Amino acid sequence: MSLREPVELLDPSAVGPVYFIAIGGAGMSGVARIYHDLGVEVRGSDQVDSANLRDLASLGVQTWVGHDPSHLAGARTVVVSSAIRPDNPELVEAHRLGLRIWHRSAALAALMLGREGVSIAGTHGKTTTTGMVATMLDCAGADPSYVIGSPLAATGMSSHLGGGEAFVVEADESDGSFLQYPSQIVVVTNVEADHLDNWGTPQAYFDGFVSMATRPEVRYVVTNADDPGAAELACRLESTGTVRVVTYGESEQAEVRLVDLDLNGTTASATLVYGPTQGRLELQVPGRYNLSNAAAAYCVGSLLGISHQDLLTGIASFTGTLRRFQLVGRVADVSVFDDYAHHPTELRATLGAARRVVTGQGRVIACFQPHLFSRTRDFAGEFGSALTLADRVIVSDIYPAREDPIPGVTGELVHDAVIAAGGDSRYVPDKQDLPEALAEEVRPGDLVITLGAGDVTLVGPVLVGLLEGKA
């Protein structure tokens, strides 16, 4: 199904019972939960059991492990994600029965009808910025609804149905989902070519952001003045005069400026200047990139009428989202972190933050699992260069996600690129071997970080267990 054109949306109360294929996924489970909280009958299945599946079942949602056409009995609407293949037996049955079939983005867009929609978009930083906005509004008493791609560390929740006017969503550009959301406020953290397997060319990818930002209901577009792609988008939009553009960043041209940055270990702070108003932005998460994300969140809150001090207080309470520089454990003076970074720019930002956390003779050891064959093919050299920010690199084979293999494309391309860029790398293709390989490498004072959008996240807890056994 094409996501380049908006689909007809119906009020959520008119579409049930709703059946979610792959209901246990990070994105799907959050949407399913809000439909359930609205009183819509929700059911769904997934290939494997998971905490998300069990959480939904505990709420009374009927769930199955495994896909079977019989599960669709009584359903009126079927919700799928881009990861669902056309030959999925439940999707085939939905077509045969003539049921309404919505992409996840349409199901989420329907929830935003009648609300003050806020879409957080950008190649990098969407999840964290969405989490910051949700936390900030909640602390200010605005009780927002939100759907985030990863659970908030403080609550373990990736979605919430609030009683306030604001509905904040992480707007994914990878498959064109962000074109569906009816939003009055749009944030673009950055624009850097990615997902070319779907968009084809960098220009088409950029034009997708233009299309999202020029939907008829958009009133404000918040853009990062420090990012070339977002700055180009701002210029394009300002020339049309159809929306109000608000810029943020360290640039002197930014409307909301960050100055006097302090990047200190696992925290960060800066002075935020907005016209005659200024105050200290204090974060519990590390990195220059997170200060940028916080400035974006501040802009959104200001546009929604939240006071300056409430904004600073709310953002200061944000403790992160899962899989974003998340501490897995500390054993024998070895720190183990996990991060979702899966693009060269994200690797550079995350490893840069890691270097500021490690102290003394400690090393940064990066364990990277490339995500998608097409992305590995397109960015192998850039991955290699970015990973040289680590003192030691272990590269695993590719997590395929939705893609079929591409001949000659393996994780070894990234390993070779690290070596070519002057880095120190080891290729361990089987992810089952990664915990032991890392345990052999570490010494007191080291920081280990697993990196990637796939199942490399499972490595950290196993590594911590191995290190505890040796302690």
Curated annotation (Swiss-Prot):
Its main location: cytoplasm. It is found in: Cytoplasm. One of its GO terms (cellular component) is cytoplasm. One of its GO terms (molecular function) is UDP-N-acetylmuramate-L-alanine ligase activity. Keywords: ATP-binding, Cell cycle, Cell division, Cell shape, Cell wall biogenesis/degradation, Cytoplasm, Ligase, Nucleotide-binding, Peptidoglycan synthesis. It catalyses: UDP-N-acetyl-alpha-D-muramate + L-alanine + ATP = UDP-N-acetyl-alpha-D-muramoyl-L-alanine + ADP + phosphate + H(+). One of its GO terms (biological process) is peptidoglycan biosynthetic process. It is an enzyme of class 6 (ligase). Pathway: Cell wall biogenesis; peptidoglycan biosynthesis. Gene3D superfamilies: Mur ligase, C-terminal domain, Mur-like, catalytic domain, NAD(P)-binding Rossmann-like Domain. Pfam families: Mur_ligase, Mur_ligase_C, Mur_ligase_M. Cell wall formation. This is UDP-N-acetylmuramate--L-alanine ligase. It comes from Cutibacterium acnes (strain DSM 16379 / KPA171202) (Propionibacterium acnes). The lineage of its organism: Bacteria, Bacillati, Actinomycetota, Actinomycetes, Propionibacteriales. The gene is murC.
